[in-house]
Amino acid sequence: MAYPIITRREFVTGAATVAVGTVLLGPNRLFGTVPVPDVSVVRGGSAAAATRRALELLGGMNHYVASGDTVIVKPNIGWDTRVGLGADTNPEVVKEVITMCFEAGAKKVKVFDNTCNEPRRCYQSSGIEAAAKSAGAEVEFMNENRYDQIDFPNGVRLKSWPVYRDALPGNRDKIINIPVLKHHSLPKTKSGKPGISLGFKNMMGIMGGNRGQIHNGFEENIVDFCTVIRADLTIVDATNVLRRNGPRGGRLADVEKLDTIIAGADMVAVDAWGVKTFGYEPDDLIYLSEANRRGLGHIDLSRVVTVEERLS
Amino acid sequence: MAHFQRWKNLRIGSQVFFLVVFFVLLWQARYPLGGPFPMDLFLRLDPLLGILLSIASRVVLLSFALSLIIIVLTLIFGRAFCGWICPLGTTFDVADHLMKSRAHGTRIRTRWWKYVVLIGLMVAAILSYQGLWFFDPLVLLDRTATGVILPWFWFLIKELFATTFNIPVIQNPAFGLYNPLAGVIIPLSQPLFLHSMSILLFFVGILALEKLHRRFWCRSLCPLGALLGVFGHRAPFQRTVKSDCNECALCRENCKMGAIHKDYDRTNRADCILCLNCAIICPQDSITFEFASLKHSPAAFDLTRRRWIGAAVAGVAVVPLIKTTRTTNQLSSRSLRPPGALPEDLFLNRCVRCQECVQVCSSTGGCLQPSLLETGWDGCWSPIANMRMGYCEYQCNLCSKVCPSGAIHKITLEDKQSRKMGRAFFDRNRCIPYDRMEDCLVCEEHCPTPEKAILFDVRETRRPDGTIADVKFPYVRLDRCIGCGICEYICPLPGESGVYCTRENEERWGQKTNIAFTS
């Protein structure tokens, strides 16, 4: 008999091993079909190409946006500064994201931000209004009479806060957060190094009220906020990175061109990659550790499945 | 008669047209500032402003060169400006109809007052004081429109929409209607002014005088009317009466300017504003308006020598009266002037309180406010920056672009971004990190200078609850701070801010600060 002989016991053990392995590791990794990483990091290339590639590596935009969806694209439009100074999100990234949303079948894409300087100035000089409109999105100024008070039942410090109505679940299907990686003195670090602004901080753009009060106890407040309002996809713009004098900046000397796009659905993992890109250890940022501790995502990058790629 | 009815319709059309243009131009004074016509067109057409400001500031102000058009028009047609163009005059006509006030064309005993006002202003201008900010009719309407009428109107519109935003079924279509207009036609943020009531009261007072008789202001108080009367009292185009007049007195009774002499034949061309009402009301059709040889004008100015001298003395007397009122240092130190403003005395001498700068500022940073007595009676309604109500946008120099009189010098954006309006101070009793020993840094976050003017010290601190923590304590770097006030505006404390701006270190146009700083 040329057949290999397996006993009944060997068969049962082997089958059980495969079954347990499948459950533990996930079928994709075991059988090598369509691996969808948690985070993709694309370096080099144009901002638009890098953004597109980052989404392709994550399985494409239709992995996140379904046909007929109403999508909120939330870039950072906080400041009345020129394109390239790293205070606002790169308009090319915003435009590419909107284009991909429509390719995935989105019915409507809305773009807005609660700005720090005068809204029209910010929308215009950031280049985002023009870019988003050219891609077919609706660009709106947020209206002070359209905020709803939202409760945060698991909030440690933040119990209730006004949030922009259009960004609330029920009024939209998906929310795509596009922060710009930059220096910001507010988020505390364990090491005492200057803080960094990323996806969590960018969520403040859909808050209303006296937002300055969020600053006292920022680390707890922002995590409390994201226990209820979470982005479905976060895309970090690390193309022009403001190293000093953030979050507003204004000097080209403070900007470093890193030409990097980081994308993923795990808000904590994406921010952690952003922090790493800035040159810090992820758990140095206190709000990230806090978010990780409360189960909003994964801070340990060794356990986050990441695909990195460099475009030429 | 029918002939003049057509002309009267044309006159009313002209009045409505210029009133609308006035408001459209004023509304156009907003970010991003554009449009083919200067928004201060009416002020530039005002010869009273041009002449008296030039005298008071000892400079020929060419920005008022357009007012020559009005002077030439007046030399030919008399005070046609007052009857056909002046938006304040039109406002009175509308108010008169609503209030049913009567012409009382025979009440003429107070009409010389306006020459006293003009002479007083002239004498004061020679002594380098301009009182135009109180008396000029176009400035008056500009100020009332900016400070009261437009904010009132926008509030009404915005509130109506805001109500619909909370009604489930119609909220989305209502917002869809509203949002394309927001920031384009409807201001994004509601203009709010601390002292708008004082502006309104002044305006209501003048309107109330209309109850005495029509066009009271124009007949008896308006210095621009007086000046145009001087230019136009021998105008060739005039009212003439044919010999078939039966002296029914209707024209004289119904003259809203009281310009018809009691012989019904002669007209006071220093007062006639060519409204044409007399030609229409005349049952005999004997009144017409035409170019005619110069007729004798009845005592056009009603000014005796005693009144001349009295007016001049009043002009001299009022200047020290106003100039010797001052406010406390504390109030005026919190009253920052717009960037590019002339040194204070020159500034007050040039600023006519038209509120063009306030209007344009309300569409962007929103810090400029008409003051009341913060800078003295002398500075009433002059623009001051209230940094708790708004702040000076780092990328904006629009106020300097709209100033019609040059009280705010036209400065470039680069100049503005390094020119100090004042400086920021931390109130360490109120500022959150000093008071609660908690991080805050909203001011540092917003500080717009490329290298931050607000920095912070990290110090290990014992908190009220006994724990030890690193706290970021903010401070100001004087050499970088331009006093834009965004820190004061954005401070999350309720009421008084934990950081505030004063005029210390300010750099007015043509004047650099001498204060040396070390940091």
Could you describe each region identified by the protein language model?
Chain A
Residues 2-312:
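N-terminal and secondary-structure boundary signal
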